[in-house]
Amino acid sequence: MNEKLALSDDILMKIEKPARYIGNEVNAVVKDLNNIDVRFCMCFPDVYEIGMSHLGIQILYGMLNSWDDVWCERVYSPWVDLDAIMRKENIPLFALESQDPVKNFDFLGITIQYEMCYTNILQVLDLAQIPLLAEERGDDCPIVIGGGPCTYNPEPIADFFDIFYIGEGETQYRPLIDLYKKCREEKVGREEFLRRAAKLPGMYVPRFYETAYHEDGTIASFRPTEEGISATIRKELVTDMTDSFYPMKPVVPYIKVTQDRVVLEIQRGCIRGCRFCQAGQLYRPVRERDVEILKKYAMEMLKNTGHEEISLSSLSSSDYSKLPELIDFLMEECNKRHINISLPSLRIDAFSLDVMSKVQDVKKSSLTFAPEAGSQRLRDVINKGLTEEVILQGSALAFEGGWTRVKLYFMLGHPTETEEDIRGIAELSNKIAATFFDTVPKEKRVNGRVQIVTSTSFFVPKPFTPFQWAPQCTKEEFVEKAYLTRKAISEQLNQKSIKYNWHEADVSVLEGVLARGDRRLSQVLLYVYHKGCFYDAWSEYFHNDVWMEAFAACGLDPDFYSHRERPLDEILPWDFLDCGVSRAFLEREWQKAKNETISPNCKQACQGCGAARFGCGICVEPRG
């Protein structure tokens, strides 16, 4: 236990939730500085409660600390109240475990999960008193390394990072740290370390690449500036999930966080191939963990944390081949210990409903469907393997089982979307409500009514998806679509049973710009940050007018990045990365979308996406 605190009692008493900053949580790792060689600070650039809920941080934290020569600590974005105090009193950002300044570490690793956290990256660097621009850092600064899904287009933030780790973090940190130690022994400086790091698999060092542009703003070329540095960086991948590291002693916070439970990752990847979904492409191929190992992990983590709930983590839990066996085991063991089980990402069918009725309070819980589009035509465009018949059958089974609350998730603005598709959202919501009244006798209806919560987000095209070439709607178009949805719901027979929620259009448009932007956007990020923008993912701190001012000041048009269809022969900012899925496959899927043609999932038939080259997972298993 570390008794030192970077913040005085006076400051801790002034701020919201001081437990965010004092460390010493259950299973936090403290090491003797005299016995380690490398100090690594792992950062999630958002508030503590969100960062502490992220499984990837827990995996890397546990893995790095399993090595005797490394001490990995954590840091999160200070909330706005402490941010103001730290600036006023010149308190440098500190790591939780040692309470030492982050600027004194060897590495600062930042996981980047969401584009709207980009300004928080600048906040972290600024509060840590590390120069924002990588080119301005000297040998006394930490190596700033970024990872996570947003690094599959790292260009908008390339100027702020020394290294991007492309792919899954379990494979290359050991070679990177060994290289760092070797360079330190040889007394070579930062530049030479980065030059050597750029030759490691999965490492992208932006300073050794340059971009040229056409007069119209599109990319003319992107190439390395030195010999021996690869023009293409291939993602890192864990080929055997069963043997890969998993944290048996995850850190347990003192305050309630977003995901306050044991998280058991049962598999990585998804077989479904939804054309809008970036995760479904990035994490190919699907790789399962052995069910016996998962049983052991579950019991060990529950024992080591004292958590009262366990959740299965996967993009599509229903596709895990040993799910019935695993759930039977967990139900038996967790019932003995009065542990709750959370089962997200399940398809709603008879098996799932039977399981959920045993592990949830039916009267209090709600069922979730994600049709994503209102019509079957548009669901075929996006390759969402879910028919209206399946949704209504699942709803009927659920209502028979006692459920009275249903959540529906849709996206507005998919490519080729029409007014008829949008009206389909209201019509499907109404049909589900009607199914309740047709299925449940009047005397058995709780409060006499079903609750349908229909939510729409706005479509954001992402790199390495078949829709990476698609235009995004403007803010005005998005708002018009949301109003049309609301009006159509109000016209339904069962409209009193339907509640409608929709997302902020400004944020979705900006997310789209940052998701498919190039290196020139770094000047926009610097502009808005210096104007006071951070925590842009939080609506109360998002200032769209400042962002629009920044684009104008920097001579950049946000519509160039979002509101145009990109030709197939255009060089995209992320084309130098190899995510395992081929460009030819994405082009085929883009054409299939335009033709309203579906593709079978990976278990039904291989679509030749390119992931088979990794020689693991679903790609080497028999299909049927």
Q: Where is each model-derived feature located?
A:
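N-terminal pre-triad scaffold of radical SAM enzymes
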Residues: 40-46, 64, 251-278, 302, ...
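A short beta-strand-loop structural module common to alpha/beta enzyme folds
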Residues: 69-81
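N-terminal [4Fe-4S]-dependent radical SAM core
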Residues: 11-41, 48-49, 206, 213-263, ...
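Conserved SAM/AdoMet-binding glycine-rich loop
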Residues: 42-43, 116, 300-407, 411-453, ...
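Flexible loop/turn segments at secondary-structure boundaries
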Residues: 48-51, 80-83, 116-118, 151-154, ...
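Glycine-rich beta-alpha loop elements in corrinoid/cobalamin-binding modules
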Residues: 78-223, 466-518, 525-540
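Radical SAM enzyme core and accessory elements
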Residues: 1-30, 34, 40-42, 491-624
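Canonical Radical SAM [4Fe-4S] cluster-binding loop centered on the CxxxCxxC motif
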Residues: 54, 256-292, 608-623
